[in-house]
Amino acid sequence: MSKEGLIAAKELKRLQTQSVRLDRFIGSHVSRLLKSDLVSVLAEFQRQNQVFLCMKLYEVVRREIWYRPDMFFYRDMLMMLARNKKVDETKKVWEDLKKEEVLFDQHTFGDLVRGFLDNELPLEAMRLYGEMRESPDRPLSLPFRVILKGLVPYPELREKVKDDFLELFPGMIVYDPPEDICEDSDEEARTDSDLE
């Protein structure tokens, strides 16, 4: 990131609570940044989980003349929103992605579904899973296995995905963890705390 990018990032963080000044700064300074700086500032804010600023820069990037719809751009936004449990923003980004006809590959779908599951957003994860099933891409077993592992805390949802997996890949085996796996870890935690 260049000096201009660093200055812009610092100023954006400083102005984020002052909407009028923030919008003015975005219009006068941020929109003049080089593509690499603008994308770097957005990536840094994603890393820092600065949801509000990420959404602002997301809109700026999409208005740029050089912008082309990109699977990785959307994947990074959705993963950051999942980490921060931002369902409304996720729906907005997903609508934009659909309008721009961006297609995810099966591995990216698997990573996204798992990201939402790991952040305790099973409804959003299953909505993405539905999109994955409707995708024109040929189904692959690895993304299903990634999703099945993330669904261990949600047995009903796991059974549905497991049935789909066995229908698509009839010769494959699905590992089912012991039913008391969650109970065992809770008991171990209690036992450890009792010893202290």
Curated annotation (Swiss-Prot):
Keywords: Repeat. Pfam families: PPR. InterPro entries: Pentatricopeptide_rpt (IPR002885), THA8L-like (IPR044795), TPR-like_helical_dom_sf (IPR011990). It comes from the Eukaryota. PPR repeats lie at residues 70-104, 105-139. Coiled coil: none annotated. Belongs to the PPR family. P subfamily. This is Pentatricopeptide repeat-containing protein At1g62350. It comes from Arabidopsis thaliana (Mouse-ear cress).
